[in-house]
Regions:
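Helix-loop junctions and terminal segments of transmembrane helices
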Residues: 30-45, 271-293
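Transmembrane helical elements of multi-pass membrane transporters/channels
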Residues: 169-176, 180, 184, 200-283, ...
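Membrane-proximal transmembrane or re-entrant/amphipathic helices at the cytosolic face
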Residues: 450-513
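Membrane-interface helix-loop junctions in multi-pass transport and translocation proteins
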Residues: 123, 134-183, 370, 380-417, ...
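Alpha-helical transmembrane segments of multi-pass membrane transporters/permeases
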Residues: 96, 101, 112-142, 146, ...
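Interfacial/gating helices of multi-pass transporter permease domains
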Residues: 2-23, 90-91, 158-163, 209-216, ...
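Interfacial segments at transmembrane-helix termini and the short loops linking adjacent helices
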Residues: 80-99, 302, 320-350
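Signature of the first transmembrane helix
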Residues: 1-34, 64, 71, 75, ...
Length: 513
């Protein structure tokens, strides 16, 4: 709905503002949830509850300082950022100033999420994320509409619409922080009671704790910063390359909007699931590393990669098969042909991002923190060369960005996989992890395409055709993966509602054990 309100040009400004916001958020505090969960889990595994509580408190101070400092920089430096880096996106300073306090809110929220994850509970994080997205979606639409109405005579009308979308981001984050704050208030007596019963007196000083936080968070920040830099570099190269070809600013902003707020937005949904799996894996993996249980480490890594592939393959195939119908359904007023083609040709990035995300989490958990950074830098260098070459010497236009978005995680995947294999001395099982999900997804894709086309020919309505197509997609993939023994009963239990799914599977004789 927001795309229909502010248009592709407004979404281009919105996406460019978020590129800046994301990289500054990463620099200030993005790595805190993972870092805090890793440090808290390590302390709790050794029953050092006083140390775990101190890690949390010092991490919170660090987040408040770094998040506050970066928020002030964005608010007062928004005009300079627009003039220096985004001259083609007029008015981008408006949504940037709205996003400035969001950096501070997310910094504090990230530390609270890291605490709960380190305590091996993902529920507060999951609920807060759902609340955040609901508030974000509702407020973004309402705020975009009212701000565009109030500034209808402004030359920066699209920028005001983009600012409305960022208001939703701010209030969504604030609502999630309020929820986590309430949970922490209820949970704090338990933390203090554990700390009082702990007979181990921490020997570390405040300086030692801050050093530990920095050495843990900096590699995570650098790794994520490199990834986010690829987005900003893409926007910058694309901007200059298109200007050099004589393309006007409106067309540039529109194409950038389609790429960022349709293609990247849709592929980011399954990628977010992979990120959540990687985040939930870290505390448990750190505990095994702390106790030196190498068998448990290998088993957990194997399962994390397998679960990611079970989700990533059908997501990539499904988005490719239903690319144009999904774009037309979600963004009816926009260019669904270009957006659909981007999604169709670039959905394979989901598989590579899923694998690179989980393997980066593994390397960080086993204290090989510098390797994901090095791999990301190597991949970024290759990515820049590929994107620049395609934009400079071919007529691919925005599709060069799509191609680059596939090559970046592909290189990281290869380098991470090699390092995980060397450091842990094992090879990932191939048939059930990769071959079964791939084959099941291909068959699922064929069935989904046939069902969609049949229903669309009869009804001529996208929503009438896409619903049965999605039902067939889910049912066929579920049946094929189980029938081909891609998942055992015990593995199925690890999924949400896994026991209920096993009951359904038994009725259709899909499980062999």
């Amino acid at each position: 709905p927001m795309v229909n309100i502010i248009g592709d040009e407004g979404m281009g400004i919105y996406s460019a503002a978020f590129e800046v916001y994301n990289i500054l958020l990463i620099i200030s505090s993005y790595g805190m949830p993972m870092a805090v969960s890793k440090m808290v889990s390590a302390k709790c595994t050794k029953k050092e509850y006083k140390g775990a509580y101190r890690v949390f408190r010092y991490s919170m101070v660090f987040s408040i300082f770094s998040g506050g400092l970066m928020a002030l920089f964005v608010f007062f430096g928004a005009g300079w950022i627009e003039r220096t880096f985004f001259s083609s996106f007029q008015g981008i300073s408006i949504p940037l100033r709205v996003l400035a306090p969001t950096i501070f809110v997310v910094a504090v929220m990230g530390t609270l999420r890291g605490l709960f994850q380190g305590k091996n509970t993902m529920l507060p994080t999951a609920v807060s994320q759902i609340l955040e997205q609901i508030v974000n979606a509702v407020v973004s639409i309402v705020a975009a509409y009212y701000l565009m109405s109030d500034h209808s005579a402004s030359k920066n009308l699209s920028a005001w619409g983009a600012a409305g979308g960022t208001v939703g981001t701010l209030l969504g984050a604030a609502s999630a922080l309020l929820f986590l704050g309430m949970i922490y208030t209820l949970y704090r007596p338990v933390l203090r009671r554990q700390a009082r019963r702990d007979r181990i007196t921490p020997r570390e000083s405040a300086a030692d704790y801050y050093k530990l936080i920095l050495w843990t968070v900096i590699p995570i920040i650098l790794s994520q910063t490199v990834y986010q830099l690829s987005g900003i570099i893409d926007v910058t190269i694309f901007n200059f390359a298109m200007e050099a070809r004589g393309v006007n600013a409106t067309v540039i902003s529109t194409l950038q909007g389609i790429y960022s707020t349709k293609y990247r937005l849709l592929v980011s949904v399954p990628i977010a699931v992979s990120t959540a799996i990687a985040s939930s894996m870290i505390p448990s993996l750190v505990a095994s590393v702390t106790t030196g249980d190498r068998r448990a480490i290998k088993d957990k890594v194997t399962m994390a990669v397998k679960f990611n592939m079970i989700i990533a393959f059908p997501s990539a195939v499904g988005l490719a098969i239903l690319a144009q119908p999904i774009i037309r359904l979600l963004f009816p007023a926009s260019d669904y042909v270009t957006g659909g083609m981007m999604l169709m040709t670039g959905s394979t990035c989901i598989i590579f991002y899923a694998l690179s995300t989980v393997t980066s989490g593994v390397l960080q958990s086993i204290d090989r923190m510098n390797l994901p950074v090095m791999h990301s830098l190597i991949s970024l260098a290759i990515h820049v060369v590929v994107v620049f070459t395609l934009l400079r010497f071919t007529g691919m236009g925005a599709y060069a960005l799509v191609f680059g978005n596939v090559t970046y995680p592909l290189v990281v995947c290869f380098l991470n996989g090699r390092s995980v294999s060397r450091n842990l001395g094992f090879k990932q099982e191939v048939v059930k992890t990769f071959c079964v999900p791939f084959l099941s997804s291909v068959v699922m894709g064929i069935l989904t395409f046939v069902v969609y086309e049949l229903f669309f020919i009869v009804s001529h309505r996208i929503y009438v055709a896409i619903v049965p197509a999605l039902v067939v997609a889910v049912a066929s993939y579920f049946a094929l993966v189980l029938k081909l023994q891609g998942l055992s009963r015990s593995e199925l239990y690890e999924f949400p509602m896994g026991r209920k799914m096993s009951i359904v599977a038994d009725k259709f004789h899909l499980l062999n054990d």
